[in-house]
Amino acid sequence: MGAPLLSPGWGAGAAGRRWWMLLAPLLPALLLVRPAGALVEGLYCGTRDCYEVLGVSRSAGKAEIARAYRQLARRYHPDRYRPQPGDEGPGRTPQSAEEAFLLVATAYETLKDEETRKDYDYMLDHPEEYYSHYYHYYSRRLAPKVDVRVVILVSVCAISVFQFFSWWNSYNKAISYLATVPKYRIQATEIAKQQGLLKKAKEKGKNKKSKEEIRDEEENIIKNIIKSKIDIKGGYQKPQICDLLLFQIILAPFHLCSYIVWYCRWIYNFNIKGKEYGEEERLYIIRKSMKMSKSQFDSLEDHQKETFLKRELWIKENYEVYKQEQEEELKKKLANDPRWKRYRRWMKNEGPGRLTFVDD
């Protein structure tokens, strides 16, 4: 018996190499084999042309397509279908009429949308881009139907509403707390007496309201006076509409432009012209050195800010000295704190529990 013409390794020597050199360029083409026709089963109207299904040309407008769809839908609707004499097209039986109706509906859904129709026309003109047509078809079908912009807008509005009520709740808690502080409560009570508000509340409630109701009304009067006389700053300040997320996004371009203008003025006035810092600029530098937010810095007492200005903490060297003093003062407080002493004693004698894997 003679030896085979080619061994499993594509032949030996020069013959095998020649076969490999001839087949290698053809491998990509073999991997990309695709149907030659433009109409593909499973895409749009399948192997039927959507334009032919509706009986319209490719240049037909939306009105003509809609009119053709209504005529065919009435004709092939399963509930209204009646076979016509000599009807040789699809839909000669109720079952085939239902299939024809679904095909007509698919053709109309494909051609009524401009983007889908554009993809379909491109598929008819470029049948060779087989995998690209699959991608565009299923990417549109699987894309979310809800507009992402609507989802973002609703989410931002929901967060803004939550912010407003949360801040308002914090503000009311701060007012309720200040109403229990003797210093502010006495002052508010004196103002209420001077304005005759407490007397009016008692007269108004006489013979009509219980003592508890009168007490609640007086409490509300005191809280209203505190609201009008005390400017709460920081995290418990009165909520402002412009601080909500929705308005922050709307005003973001304005804030960005304002910051750029402010920064350019700062560079021009203080870095180029060498002007002396004003009180506002000094407090800004101090706040940045302390790494505090604007709301945190605004919540500080006025006498603290005056101390910062007197010690000229906007100068880096002075701030470093002040920072060192604060650290030393904190160490002294901790050294004299009984709880801190107990903690250090416990750490020295017992220390934290240890895990060990040594057998006893």
UniProtKB/Swiss-Prot annotation:
Q: Which GO terms describe its biological process?
A: protein folding
Keyword Transport present in the record's keywords: the answer is no
Which keywords has UniProt assigned to this entry? Chaperone, Membrane, Transmembrane, Transmembrane helix
Question: Lineage, please?
Answer: Eukaryota, Metazoa, Chordata, Craniata, Vertebrata
Q: Tell me which PANTHER family the record gives.
A: DNAJ HOMOLOG SUBFAMILY C MEMBER 25
Looking at the Swiss-Prot or TrEMBL record, what is one Pfam family this protein matches?
Answer: DnaJ
Provide the primary localization.
membrane
Keyword field contains ATP-binding: no
The membrane-topology field of this record reads: Multi-pass membrane protein
Q: Where is this protein localized, as stated in its record?
A: Membrane
Record domain J: where:
49-124
InterPro entries, from UniProt?
DnaJ_domain, DNAJC25-like, J_dom_sf
* SUPFAM superfamilies, per database record: Chaperone J-domain
- Give the protein's recorded name: DnaJ homolog subfamily C member 25
Q: Which domain of life is it from?
A: Eukaryota
